[in-house]
Curated annotation (Swiss-Prot):
Lineage of source species: Bacteria, Pseudomonadati, Pseudomonadota, Gammaproteobacteria, Methylococcales
GO cellular component labels: plasma membrane
Note accompanying the cofactor annotation: Binds 1 [2Fe-2S] cluster.
Keyword annotations of the record: 2Fe-2S, Cell inner membrane, Cell membrane, FAD, Flavoprotein, Ion transport, Iron, Iron-sulfur, Membrane, Metal-binding, NAD, Sodium, Sodium transport, Translocase, Transmembrane, Transmembrane helix, Transport, Ubiquinone
Transport recorded as keyword: yes
Subcellular compartments: Cell inner membrane
Gene assigned in the entry: nqrF
Protein name: Na(+)-translocating NADH-quinone reductase subunit F
Required cofactor names: [2Fe-2S] cluster; FAD
Length: 407
């Protein structure tokens, strides 16, 4: 019995000693406490060692754009690290060239704060704010697209430029597609593909970016066009649906939603050149924002055309609004193209893919398509097809502006 007691005693003593050794080593090898991060040579923040730079900035109300929520894939959270950032990581090299890296460009979501740092961020970051908004409405405008309207707190406004975007946050959640409020006229395909059985289970907070559909004079609100991201056909049990789009589709009037912004690069140039807008799907959002801003706020007299592609009339939205703008503004024309019109549509307008319609019905006989400015947002295949068509007819790449968010 004595031997057993002694054995237990010595074993416990050894374990306790090892714990103290490990804790002592940790105190020597692992830095703790806070360090200073100097931003733009003006503002200093105190940051816990081990934080990601993106998170540290957000904790100090400096919201750097990050459409992927810090996953290192969107490359929007770029900052310049002038001192203290360590070596650039392999995860950053696919987004940052050697020349840019030599200038200190880094992805803030990939930079771990280990020592005092000096960084430079875009001035617009200092104007980015965060709000808790209230859902005013969340209606379908197409089979798989919602128009989400958020009300800002009383007296608040997002000071944005047309073509800008916000980031929306979602907490961990569980939802069933069967709980979505889908209007009766849009349920046919949901029934056909039995989408009601899909569920979304999200265990960690997420952030995504969405272009705004409202324009700056529509104050006090944020309007988004959001397409639901469903799993590939036959993969419903193994591939999850879109994290943020499922969350948004499940929102009801009165729900609270946290957003931050404004951000943006997809802005109209201040020239007299003709503007050609091309959109499809949820890419309608920045198109609406730009066109409304040009015609209603700026009273622009620039020549403008808008080419929007949809499958059928059911998938086309804001038709009455654009019809009214066209009637009231002689410098603006808009054209709808349907790729798969339904018999009940009685469609006599343009049919086919929008890049072909744009070329055959307009640019083919345009006296100088290379002198126009092109603004586009839509599904990836549409974007690629339009860009290639424009390059083929001699348009410089610098005159092709693309918003990758809205599709």
């Amino acid at each position: 019995m004595l031997e057993i007691i002694l054995g237990v005693f010595f074993f416990t003593a050894i374990v306790v000693a090892l714990v103290f050794v490990i804790l002592g080593a940790k105190s020597k090898l692992v830095a703790e406490g806070n360090v200073e991060v100097l931003i733009n040579g003006e503002r200093t923040i105190h940051v816990p060692i081990g934080s990601k730079l993106l998170t540290a900035l957000a904790d100090n109300n400096l919201f750097v754009s990050s459409a992927c929520g810090g996953g290192g894939t969107c490359a929007q959270c770029r900052v310049q690290v002038l001192e203290g950032g360590g070596e650039i990581l392999p995860t950053e090299l696919s987004h940052i060239t050697k020349r840019e890296a030599a200038q200190g460009d880094r992805l803030s979501c990939q930079v771990t704060v280990k020592q005092n740092m000096k960084i430079h961020v875009h001035e617009e970051v200092f104007g980015v704010k965060k709000w808790e908004c209230t859902v005013r409405s969340n209606r379908n405008v197409a089979t798989f697209i919602k128009e989400l309207v958020l009300e800002l707190p009383a007296g608040e406004n997002v000071d944005f430029r047309a073509g800008g975007y916000i980031q929306i946050e979602c907490p961990p959640y569980d939802c069933k597609f069967s709980d979505f409020a889908i209007e009766p006229e849009y349920r046919e395909d949901w029934d056909k593909y039995d989408l009601w059985k899909i569920e979304s289970h999200v265990k960690a907070p997420a952030i995504r970016a969405y272009s705004m559909a409202n324009y700056p004079e529509e104050k006090g609100i944020i309007m988004l066009n959001v397409r639901i991201a469903t799993p590939p056909w036959g993969k419903e049990g193994t591939v999850p649906p879109g994290v943020m789009s499922s969350y948004i589709f499940n929102l009801k009037p009165g729900d609270k939603v946290t957003i931050s912004g404004p951000f943006g690069e997809f802005f109209a140039r201040d020239t007299d050149k003709e503007m050609v807008f091309i959109g499809g799907g949820a890419g309608m959002a920045p198109m609406r924002s730009h066109i409304f801003d040009q015609l209603l706020r700026l009273k622009s007299k620039r020549k403008m055309t808008f080419w929007y592609g949809a499958r059928s009339l059911r998938e086309a939205f804001y038709v009455e609004e654009f019809d009214r703008l066209q009637a009231e503004n002689p410098n603006f024309k808009w054209f709808l193209g349907l790729s798969d019109p339904k018999p009940e549509d009685g469609w006599t307008g343009y049919t086919g893919f929008i890049h072909n319609i744009l070329y055959e019905q307009y640019l083919k006989n345009h006296p100088a398509p290379e002198d126009c400015e092109y603004y586009m947002c839509g599904p990836p295949m549409m974007n690629s097809a339009v860009i290639q068509m424009l390059l083929d007819i001699g348009v410089d790449r610098e005159n092709i502006m693309l918003d990758d968010f809205g599709g």
